Amino acid sequence: MKRIIECVPNYSEGRDKSVIDAIVAAIAAVEGVKVLDVDPGEATNRTVVTFVGEPEPVVEAAFRGAAKAQELIDMRQHHGAHPRSGATDVLPLIPVSGITLEECATLARGLAERMYKELGIPCYCYEAAAFKPERRNLAVCRAGEYEALPEKMADPDRKPDFGGAWDEVAARAGATNVGAHNFLIAVNYNLNTTSTRRAMAVAFDVREKGRKAREGGSLTGKLLKDEKGEQIWIPGTLKGCKAIGWYIDEYGIAQVSMNITDIDTVPLHVAYEEVCRAAAARGLKVTGVEIVGLVPKRVLIDAGKFYLTKQQRSLGISEEEILKIAVKSMSLDDLKPFNPKEKVIEYLMEDEAELAVREKLVRMSVKGFAAETASESPAPGGGSISAYMGALGAALATMVANLSSHKRGWDDRWKEFSDVAEKGQALMAELLALVDEDTAAFNRIMDCFSMPKGTPEEKAARAAALEEATLYAASVPLKTMEAALKALPLALEMAQKGNPASASDAGVAALAAVAGIRGAALNVRINAAGLTDKTPAEPLLKRADAIIAEALALQDEVLSAVNTHIEQ
């Protein structure tokens, strides 16, 4: 698995585009780094930049971004609504894949040390990178903000982890908080009020830290302390969430600004529902939600499925539709258009040019795909067509499940059919991917024929490559057979238990799946026949025969159930 990390620095400039552009350019200049998002905020005078890549390039880009921010931002002149302590205020490293949080913490500490040694920027290490337990909390590191730095840097207990005395460099650049944490979602909830105090009250209700306990529970009551003389806190309802309330000039209303630090414990939709509940309890309403930066796709998928479940609607619909439900349900497009292609990290990490090649066939129209198949080009051929027939079989079974899930009078069975539809959607996606993979496997064989064969060594290399490519070309249609076979039990269940009016559709689903299976089997056999060494193909051929036998038996059951419905 490729080692990928994300970096989401916050720079203390949200108004001067030339400064923002220069910082982003410094980051993007590092080879292997992809800038995914730049989100400036005028009211907060702060810009959040998101970039990803392998660890070494990302750390280098983070360093260069901090150096450019130090050059262009003078903290002595900075004012904004958001707490801040430096030109580069926070600089977190976040594991995405193939790397642990602990490894990111080590990288963060090394980055902080380098920033001080080479740039003279004082650095605090927070969250997983913290050297002191209390500094796991960013608020502790940033306490007093920029204005408190001279005093903090003179205090041995509060001085930065890397940094000396207050000097000209610190005065200009401030201090940077370098850390490592799991994926964090920053989200703002607009309220139908201009009252900062009421927004703060909602924030206190929901944030994990909660609010200070007061005598009688009143706003002005005496602060309550425990037997040790320490302040008593009333915890909020959302674990791992930090929140404050403030007034935003840009929108002319107050909002609750929240960081969700553990999306497994508190998913985005859970936080949204709780903020809405807390606001309503105080006579307020959430009027719009904005996600700052990016989110993993699963955050929105989980949200969409949550709201579909509340509606007792099938979850077996397209990914695009699930995302649409999530966006509408959480008012993500009330403030401005919300485009998942621009806000979901997985979409932004995709190389569109590479994706266009990999999905060349499935991106075609039905007419275009048929025309391409009919052309004199040998690909797409029977293997791709077999995968597509299998995909259509899975799609038809899914359609019957969705129709049954929403059938009047069957409300109590919606989950039963939704589960079938979800399985069908997954199989359809798998088989559609095999449409292009089968053609890619054929092209791999063709590429081998263009390899040089002038010397004995070249001939041997060419023969070995051709043997490997041919075996791969035999294995791909077997994957098609396996996937299409899984569609048949779904078709059978829908033929037996689904909406009777759609029985014929379940029958066609089975016929299409079996056609895909038998067509793919021919491709397994013809490619296996092209191998010099037939031994590796023996288990493939044996499995293909078993799949055909199982598929034909299931097809008979489906057609029997369908004919029973038709003849009633």
Go through each PLM region and give its residues.
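Amphipathic, well-ordered alpha-helical segments in soluble domains
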Residues: 65, 369, 395-399, 434, ...
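Amphipathic alpha-helix face/heptad-repeat signature
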Residues: 388-392, 420, 427-434, 473-483, ...
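Polytopic transmembrane helical bundles with strong interfacial aromatic enrichment
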Residues: 356-365, 371, 479, 483-486, ...
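Amphipathic alpha-helical interface segments
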Residues: 183-185, 438-511, 515, 527
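Preference for long, well-ordered alpha-helical segments
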Residues: 111, 121-125, 134-137, 487, ...
